[in-house]
Amino acid sequence: MSELTLIRTDSDHTDFRQLVALLDQDLAVRDGDDHAFYAQFNKVDAIKEVIVAYQNDVPVGCGAIKPFSATEAEVKRMYVHQDYRKQGIAAKIVTALENWATETGFSATVLETGKKQPEAIALYQKIGYQITPNYGQYVGVDNSVCMIKPLNAHHQTPNA
């Protein structure tokens, strides 16, 4: 198995920006006519906590968190390059983000994904996320699936 390295950075990181561009291309295909609606909520300029995953020094995945409420961080911009999927990388990125959220005082993470991303929904459920009523800008949006996970005060290790 190749070595996976996760780094903490911010949204200005070049590798993060390149991975997000690939994510946006994927979402444009999946979301179709709904893409412009979702894209307005996926700006990265205000994101300060970013994880970039490298396998053998190649950027293969990313994710981010940003404050959602006083107690919840929102997981944003999760992506693993298609050539590196099904290796547990996404679960490791999410776990690293959850640990970072815990370190910064959050007690839960929330996220939004799409019904057209069944593999993402399955992953999040596998690692402890539960479907919750759509929140914020996603209220009433039929293609959105919102999820929540309470965080332990102890750091976690991925089990996926």
Predicted segments with their positions:
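Short coil/turn segments at alpha/beta junctions that flank glycine-rich nucleotide-binding fingerprints
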Residues: T71, Q87, E103-S107
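Acetyl-CoA-dependent GNAT
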Residues: S2-K76, H81-D83, V94-T95, N134-Q137, ...
